[in-house]
């Protein structure tokens, strides 16, 4: 998988709650150029350069290079990043999910990775957990899977 540095890169964080704010703070400390947040309210927060309401997601995705998903599991967030929205991301974009596995359509993600429609992805959360041995994600191109441990790590 191609490597992209945090320094001087732009990030979009889907979910500006506790996890999203912690991610933004760490990215800022490592030199991220711009951090955009998406939340239910779109209310500004000092951890983000810009914050938009979730209703703007389809407008933000086409200009997203690195998407960090930090959403809770609610009826509104189930498969919020679905096949149609994955298709809105640029082909050189990365998807990182550290929130809840239900927020991402994993079959659509695997299909996009295998078709070269995304540069790569990293998943710390899946649905279900643990991921079954025969799940197509295990064979997806340019995918890193970790066992839901990112919250216990220190930088």
Give the role of each language-model region.
Residues 1-10, 22, 30:
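Phosphate-binding beta-alpha-beta segment of Rossmann-like dinucleotide-binding domains, i.e.
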Residues 10-12, 94:
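Residue in the alpha/beta-hydrolase core beta-strand immediately N-terminal to the catalytic nucleophile
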Residues 20, 43-44, 152:
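Flexible, glycine-rich phosphate/dinucleotide-binding loops
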Residues 24, 28, 113-114:
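Gly/Ala-rich phosphate-binding loop of Rossmann-like dinucleotide-binding domains
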Residues 33, 42-136:
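Rossmann-like adenosine-cofactor binding region
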Residues 35-37:
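Short beta-strand "acidic-cap" motif of Rossmann-like dinucleotide-binding folds
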